[in-house]
Every structure is written in C-alpha cells, then in structure tokens.
C-alpha cells in the first residue's frame, strides 16, 4: 500500500537546500541535474536518488531494528511483534560507559528512565525512576536477574557479566509481575558461553578522579582585611595589626581534597560451550577512592564478585520427534562482597568539606609545641590528635561552634559498611512442542550486612 508521507525531509546532498513533504507527500526543491537528493523519515530507510523532473519517490520500511530480540518477562520476542514499551541496553553499550554500578549504566542509554546519584560517595547508589515517580513511599523498579526477582538492588552484579538489560516501562508488565511492577521492571540477563574454543579474557583498567572545581574563598590576607573592616564599621578596634603578614595562609580545600583519586578494576572470565554444556565463569574486583578522605582511607568503595553460569542439556531429540523433545537444566550462582567507607556527606555543619569551607585561612593545620604550651587551656587535653609526623592538629576554638579541623576528623577511624550477598538460581526447561515450553525455577537470595563504627572520646 503506497501512502503519502507527511513531514519527510529532503535535502540536496552537499548543499544547504532542503524541503519537507506536505500533507499529500508533495515537495519542491531547487536542485540542478546530476545532483543527489537525500530523503529521510523515521521508520524508513534513507533514500538517495539523482535529481529529475516530476520525481516520484518511494521509501521502504527500515526493518533492521525490528529484528532485534528482546526479553519481555515471559520469553524472548522480536521487536517487530512487541507492542509493549521496552528499552534495551546491550553489552556493547555497557562496555562503552564503564559504570561503577549497573544502575549507573542506564544513564542516557534508555529513554524514559531517569537516573540520579544520591550522593558523591564512591559507589553510591543511584535513584532509578521509570517514567517519573510511581508512589509516595516507594518508586523503585522491580529488578529481575535471569528470571529471578532480586531484593535490595543489583549492586552485587559486575557490569561486565551482563549480556543485556531490558526496561519494561508500561502497564503490560503488571500482567506478568503484578503490583510489584507498578514502578516498572528492569530485566537483567547475564552472559553465557558460546560454542567454539574455550575463551579466557582478562581486563584491567585504572583511572583518576579530581574535583571539578574548588570554591573561590578568601586567602588569609583578604580574610584579615575583611575582618578588620567589619569591626571598624561596627565601631570596634581591628584585631589584626598587619593583615598582609599572613600571606595566602591555608586553603583548607587543598588540604582535604584527594587529587588523582584512583579507580581500579580487575576482571577475568572463562566461557565456552559444547552440544551438552554451556558455561561462563568470572571473577572481578573493583576499588574506588574518594576525592575527599580517600587518601586517609576514610572514603572508598570495594567490590569483589564471583559468578558461575552453567546450563546442561539432558537430552535433545528435536530431530527425532516433535513433542517433549528437549530437556535442559541450569544453575546460576553468584557471590559479592561489598565494603565502603564514607564521611559525612551533604552536611553544612561538622563535615570535613563543610569545615574546610568555613574555617579561617589564618589557621594552620597543625600547631607547634610552643603554640600549644601558650594555649594550655585549649591544647591541654589528653585526647589531642596528632598527624603521622607527630604534630598536634590545630583546634579552631569555641568561636567556630561545630566546626572542627577537617584533617583531624579525617585522621580518625571512620565507619565501615560491609555486605555479603549470595544469589542462586536453579532452573529446568522442557520443550513440550508446538512452540510451548515448560519452565520451573527455584531461587535463593541471601544477604548479610553490618557496619563497624567509631565514636571518639571528648
């Protein structure tokens, strides 16, 4: 059926001349004989043709993307026959982003999916919202990994172990997963082996992180001048006799930022397949230091992952009979140990970053013994903190309220959060015939977590 196309774009190749078809599919454009017209329209293949008078152009449908196979929750189908709203992210897409976590990998790769970072901590979880906020109390989507619902997020997965991610965005997913799918469904399929020789891969990557910018703050001289001016304007005497003697003083941001914070990843996997067995084994380690406190071992994220995907074909008689002709069983096992150390984040009062922006640049990170002796009331406590060189950390004093020396804060042991997660999925597939398949599966999802904290003496 040949029908007019409204809004198709026509351009003269190599020039700025262009036109758009009207409601009847007609167009007119200034072009010379021998030039080439380029016609584009969404859903149709691009057409290039030589210029002629009274041309009649016909576009053909672009079926290339319609042949892609997508997971829909109850099997796999071609995009050309799927009516639900599905976005797909392939392993090649993930390889181009090198994400820390799987949920971070969806940023900018799936339409209708909003991914925002909850904080700047290393390995921090992201908020994933599919087509907006679903409910007041819980807007997180349902995660399905290899057909098994997973609780508590999917940060236990190594992004390199993933074959594809499908995002089910409309109400059709509710017919499969019920009310749990009210906020959308994210289907994750992990990798398997391919027939041929055994493949062993090792990947290593190392990168650096730096703060995007430093806040523009006063140096010590500018600070002293401003303080004197404020006191004079208030009718009081200035407190600094020679503001210019302080020089630049201390930029506390330079003191606490961990420039060139490292990001490291090791991954090794082995895969293969025969007529009977399909297997994929992997081991991965990831470590990321924080740009604040990472050099004090106070802010970092580590993840150790192990995975084993195995499928065994018990019998395959598809050539001999049409009913009950194939039986296969599969075992997917995964383990992850995640640990992270963090500092106070998004806190105006008392956090290392908040203190670094608030403290006077006249103060120094440490004090000499003579200075400490001269202020015995301030430095006479038995709980004083010292740096690695044995120098006493400066105490800002009572005028700074909850602000503390950020270097002293970072020198203390921090909180260490850790978790162990075991996920096992056992399945069996029987081909009944006539396109019907019977599948039975059993899964176990075990998580153990805890935290080691430290409270300093006062």
Tell me what each language-model feature is:
Residues 1-329, 423:
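Short, small/polar-rich motifs associated with maturation and membrane association
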Residues 80, 194-249, 293-301, 305, ...:
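Surface-exposed loop/interface segments of Gram-negative outer-membrane beta-barrel transport/assembly proteins
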């Amino acid at each position: 059926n040949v029908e007019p196309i409204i809004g198709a774009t026509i351009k003269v190749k190599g020039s700025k001349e262009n036109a758009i078809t009207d409601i009847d599919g007609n167009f007119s454009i200034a072009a010379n004989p021998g030039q080439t017209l380029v016609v584009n329209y969404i859903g149709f293949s691009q057409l290039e043709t030589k210029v002629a008078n009274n041309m009649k152009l016909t576009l053909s449908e672009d079926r290339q993307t319609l042949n892609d196979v997508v997971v829909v929750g109850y099997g796999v189908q071609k995009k050309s026959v799927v009516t639900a709203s599905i976005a797909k992210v392939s392993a090649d897409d993930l390889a181009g982003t090198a994400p820390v976590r799987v949920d971070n990998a969806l940023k900018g790769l799936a339409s209708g999916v909003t991914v925002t970072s909850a904080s700047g901590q290393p390995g921090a979880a992201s908020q994933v919202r599919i087509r907006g906020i679903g409910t007041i109390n819980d807007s997180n989507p349902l995660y399905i990994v290899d057909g098994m619902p997973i609780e508590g997020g999917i940060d236990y997965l190594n992004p390199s172990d993933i074959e594809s991610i499908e995002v089910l965005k409309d109400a059709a997913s509710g017919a499969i997963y019920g009310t749990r799918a009210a906020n959308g469904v994210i289907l994750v399929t992990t990798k398997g082996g391919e027939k041929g020789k055994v493949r062993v891969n090792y990947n290593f990557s190392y990168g650096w992180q730096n703060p995007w910018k430093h806040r523009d703050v006063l140096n010590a001289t500018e600070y002293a001048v401003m303080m004197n001016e404020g006191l004079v304007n208030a009718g009081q005497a200035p407190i600094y006799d020679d503001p210019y003697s302080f020089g630049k003083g201390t930029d506390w941001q330079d003191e606490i930022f961990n420039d060139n914070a490292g990001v490291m990843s090791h991954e090794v996997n082995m895969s293969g397949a025969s007529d009977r067995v399909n297997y994929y084994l992997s081991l991965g380690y990831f470590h990321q230091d924080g740009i604040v406190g990472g050099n004090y071992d106070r802010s970092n994220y580590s993840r150790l992952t192990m995975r084993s995907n195995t499928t065994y074909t018990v019998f395959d008689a598809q050539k001999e009979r049409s009913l009950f002709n194939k039986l296969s069983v599969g075992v997917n096992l995964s383990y992850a140990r995640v640990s992270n150390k963090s500092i106070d984040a998004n806190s105006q009062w008392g956090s290392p970053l908040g203190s670094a922006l608030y403290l006077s640049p006249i103060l120094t990170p440490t004090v000499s013994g003579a200075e400490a002796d001269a202020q015995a009331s301030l430095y006479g406590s038995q709980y004083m903190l010292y740096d690695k060189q044995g120098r006493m950390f400066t105490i800002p004093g009572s005028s700074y309220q909850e602000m503390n020396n950020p270097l002293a804060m970072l020198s203390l042991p921090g909180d260490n959060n850790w978790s162990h997660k075991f996920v096992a999925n056992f399945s069996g597939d029987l081909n009944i015939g006539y396109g019907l398949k019977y599948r039975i599966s059993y899964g176990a999802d075990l998580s153990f977590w805890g935290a080691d904290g430290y409270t300093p003496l006062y």
